[in-house]
């Protein structure tokens, strides 16, 4: 059975996911067979495994860092918020039910056995499993029925590293406060602290570290620097506030609409590696004059279309599109680009039909069953944003309940393969000029040749030189991350904690 180590945090967005990714890569570099695990994840950034199951995107990234194929066992319970107090519950990769936060509070303990069974399957296949917690273990209003932090640590006998974010301030109060709110038997599982996102001279922290260690009898095992220019997907939507949008010199400006229920916003991270500045905007005044407007995925298409209307963003997007600004919609954003959205089963809200932006001659109807599959195929259309790309290979994954019907709009992609075998269907739509494009393919910009051709089509339209292809190696990004974190933490002590476990 695999040995375990767990990363918990003092709050959300302290960097648990990226630290787990780093540890996964470090253990892989050291020759171990390693896998990530998070029993319960609340996220709208989702990934589809080869089996067609949904998991949190963070666990897919961590699996990639491990050099293994993502599986539903890595995230057996996924909560996808549909409103402020209602979520769709994904269990073992498939939709289980949609319930309120209060109902889930009662339901969650019933899923503990499911979560532990998935962990045990991972332990049987690997040398090490790196577990990620969620939020904070000291959320005292939730801890009696939680199945993601101390409950998992205790059930699995997993030693815990507690991470805190020093960049936001108050890290020592957060660490001491978290320990103080834990029960004595829970504190026993905390074997070390990781101070994350530090900028400056680490030696200046010594007096505070001495106090922290004296008061809690738990050692600080690392001070990790604030990571810059890392082309690795981030999970928490708080990241959108911090996103600076580019890696290197840029010649294109891309504005991504920050929908209230935005999902899979990491679809566009790769664009920042190819000379584009990617910024998230939520007000009309922030749009400016971009070369491309992107309407991203959303868990609730109809409510977010209503938001676009009420905020004035819809009018602005339509005006700019009519003046020639390129517009791309992905998944829910693709549905929004059409003329009408129908929800006869009230899947998303009480609204059964709503006008879209009308930039594509399409209509979308929500069905009861969700489509979740990996896909591969080729570009079919050859104009505008897809100019010169006909026949270019693409791959990615689909997660949607809507079915989109095309009228005068032109199909954009031809899907030829899924994990089940050969396929033959069309995806996406473009207007005749190719200036407005929609697709259901998540992860499409991970395809380097397509990404470069897509951006160069915009450059040609703009009248600026095309860029030659640079090979972007995400594997090197994981090694870069691992090297930085390895140099910042006491791996000898972490290995000792890993080997000793909980006794």
UniProtKB/Swiss-Prot annotation:
The keyword Glycoprotein does not apply. SUPFAM superfamilies: Class I glutamine amidotransferase-like, P-loop containing nucleoside triphosphate hydrolases. InterPro entries: Class_I_gatase-like, CobQ/CobB/MinD/ParA_Nub-bd_dom, CobQ_GATase1, CobQ_N, CobQ_synth, GATase_3, P-loop_NTPase. The keyword Transferase does not apply. Pathway: Cofactor biosynthesis; adenosylcobalamin biosynthesis. Signal peptide: none annotated. One of its GO terms (molecular function) is catalytic activity. Residues 251-450 form the GATase cobBQ-type domain. The active site is at residues 331, 442. Disulfide bonds: none annotated. It holds the Pfam family CbiA. GO terms for biological process: cobalamin biosynthetic process. Keywords: Cobalamin biosynthesis, Glutamine amidotransferase. HAMAP family: CobQ. Catalyzes amidations at positions B, D, E, and G on adenosylcobyrinic A,C-diamide. NH(2) groups are provided by glutamine, and one molecule of ATP is hydrogenolyzed for each amidation. Belongs to the CobB/CobQ family. CobQ subfamily. This is Cobyric acid synthase. It comes from Dehalococcoides mccartyi (strain CBDB1). The lineage of its organism: Bacteria, Bacillati, Chloroflexota, Dehalococcoidia, Dehalococcoidales. The gene is cobQ.
